[in-house]
Amino acid sequence: MGNFFRTKVPAVSPGTSKVFGAALVTAAMALPSLQFACAEAAPDQGVVSFKYLHYKDSQIGDGVSVITGASSAGSSSRMGVNAYSMNALVPVAGEWSIGTTYTSDSVSGASPTYHSSALTKMTDLRRAVDVELTRYFLNGSLSFGTGYSKESDYISRSFSLQGSLSTEDKNTTFTLGASMNSDDINPVTLPGITYKKKVYAGIFGITRVLSKNDIVQLNLGYSNGNGDFSDPYKLYDNRPSERNNTTILARWNHHIDMTDGTAKVSYRYYSDTFGIRAHTFEGEYVQPLGRGWTVSPILRLYSQSEADFYVAVGAAEKADPTKPTKPTVDAVYYSEDQRMSAFGAITLGLKVSKQLNPDWLVDVTYEEYEQRSKWGLNGNGDSGLAPFGARSIQIGLSKKF
């Protein structure tokens, strides 16, 4: 099935809870991850790659929006990220491979204490290492992975096991995987206190070759999380100690003979016990231009409903952002984190790559992200939240050996 699809047990614990919002996750996902499992055969060449990602987000006032063309002067910067990642895949003895990824990202800027107000300055540095060992068989593969991530207030450990099995004609592949994340959170504002969280996740996928030009894939995922999901850096934030989610992901890749290009479309549905329902549609068109050049425009549409316990911006806070909205006195759970609100988002991107020779490849990806409360499918998000936007650029270089 070539490189059309690679299924991987989903990451079940984002980095630091105080920083990584929807836009940052979108940018961070562009970094390389261990996706060597479930190939049909052991690689005959090794690969070493380097990626650099620069990300910057802001609250948009009234100047020009790159995506909508609307005015958005007076925007204020929030978070900035510089991330470096090195990735290596090494074949071993014809039936094995070892893959490893090292990532270092520095974060600086300001994060809201409630809703999109009371920005608090912060800086942090995260380092992460992932290792994956894969054994290849005649009609399948089996992979074991482990990872470790550390920053000033957050330590995450992960383990994963995933296997694939293909039919004799190689036209259908079944994938089954499981993972576990164990996280320790030590808020700098609460010295001596440690919060813990564990998340178990599983995935089942089917990939099918329909024709020489078409491949489809369907993945079903489920995760169960227990521990502290509250954000200790928010003014009012007390979330349930259990969070379960279900995901459905459908993909279709179609090769167009006339242009030698490939259209890639996907749809992802997400549902969790916090009450959030989310839809993601993504389209990408990969067009070779000759002389080793390839260009790929990208469109991503996202919409989510609000969590059951989200507290919207009140009238007093709308009039004076320095006056936070208090939860009702009888509220057991509550959050004023804008990531728990209902919103919609649009991402436009462009990737350009150049095959320098059979072994060397360089690529650049630029993405522009904008988020609005009124862009959700139901159209009734929290109007008191400031619009949000982000830009990212990623540069990659890889070499086969």
Annotate each PLM feature.
Residues 1-45, 375, 401:
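Cleavable N-terminal export/targeting peptides
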Residues 41-42, 90-92, 135, 165-167, ...:
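Residue-level signature of outer-membrane beta-barrel architecture
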Residues 42, 56, 76-80, 121-125, ...:
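Short sequence motifs at beta-strands and strand-loop junctions characteristic
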Residues 48-52, 100, 144-146, 174-178, ...:
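Membrane-embedded beta-strand positions of outer-membrane beta-barrel proteins
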Residues 52-58, 104-108, 137-139, 148-152, ...:
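Transmembrane beta-strands of outer-membrane beta-barrel pores
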Residues 60-70, 111-117, 154-162, 185-193, ...:
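Outer-membrane beta-barrel translocator domains and adjoining extracellular loop/strand segments
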Residues 96-98, 139-144, 169-174, 213-218, ...:
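Repeated loop/turn-to-beta-strand initiation elements of outer-membrane beta-barrel proteins
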Residues 348, 387-401:
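Outer-membrane beta-barrel "beta-signal"
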